[in-house]
Amino acid sequence: MKKNNIPVTICEQKFGEFAKKMTRGFGKIERNFIEHMLLGMSKSQSVLLTEIARNSINDVSIKKSSERLSRQLGKFDSEKLEKNRMDLTTEILPEHKLFLVDDSEVVKPCAKKMEFLEYVRDGSDDGKLKPGYHLSEIVAVDKNRQPVSVFSRLYSVAETRFESANTVTQQAISKVVKTIGNGLFVFDRGYDDAKLFEFLEKKKQKYIIRATSKRDVLCKNGVFNIENVARSLKGKFSFQIKFQSGLKENLKASYTQIRLPKMPTTPLNMVVVYGFSKEESKPFYVLTNLKINSKEECINVVRAYLYRWKIEEYFKFKKQAYDFEKMRLQSIKALKNLNLFLTTVITFLAILGNTPLKKDLLILAQPCHPKVKFEYYRLLAGFCILARELQLRLQKPPPKSDRHIPKQRDLFYYLRYQKRFQSA
């Protein structure tokens, strides 16, 4: 037996189980559509419909196949698929859940006819305004310490029923709490808004929000700017944190209790951290409703906030590994559905990362460095190697007893007739 045969068999079983659970509750036509989208996108590492069609082994031309996928994306009802995905995602989350919230953008600088196209700030180009769409995302940290999406929505402020970005964020949090449960929500300083604080308190959720320098807070002696309060806290606790680039030492943190002017009856803790800025005297500060009574609890707040960088890595992977910003569809509904399918494909990688198969995938990827904290690139590389091996194996002529079976020979064909292949 070849050395990769066992991982190939396990991988096809995992993908078959995943596809079966994702298509639960759908009819035959929709099941085939979902299966071909998931497999084609996984193998091609692209959101281009021509590439997805090219990686679905059948007798239909690429042109007709991509046109069919485009039509189905424009009319597909995503609610059931999202529910099935969330059910699987919940299984790989730890008991104490950490949710990371952030927004990104999908830039389409050359697009002209895409529906509800608007101007967004391109974060990779000094915030310049370019045509595109907004992307709201909440990821959870799974048992493998990798980010897995629990909410993803592509939207435009030009849409007919659009209200505000705050509304999208609040709807996202409400949906996550309803489907998964309570957890600790982490936000960057772009979310420093009194409305969000009030909403999270109303929902009885724990949170950590990085504050901006414009924030005013209530202390014992009155209302002060948060920077002035931070300067009075010189860093009571010393600690160090290990990053991918090495050990970060000489870090200091302090905390104090404050209140917000618009929430004078709600006590919050302000944690001030020194050592991350090039200017040693310049700290950053986060506000949280977590209880802090010791050095350990104070440092844990800092560590939880620093997990926020995982969502930045997630956005980077989503755009680079699958060419997400190269999507070419006119309908806003089709674009939203394409985003959901890509999120589902990445969810499958997260599931693989929580199985014993993870070790084989990382070995197959032949990494240059022994260990990284963000594993999706390696998991994807290993999966694609196994998928190509499986495709070559399936292209061999079938045994005589199976010649009456239709010509289409893809992974799902193999899974449906797996017993016949094994007996032959």
Predicted regions and their residues:
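Active-site-proximal, Lys/Arg-enriched surface segment
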Residues: S66-K143, S254-I258
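Short, charged amphipathic recognition helices of the HTH superfamily
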Residues: S44-R54
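Single, function-defining residue in the core of a domain
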Residues: M1-S46, E95-K97, C110-K112, V141-A424
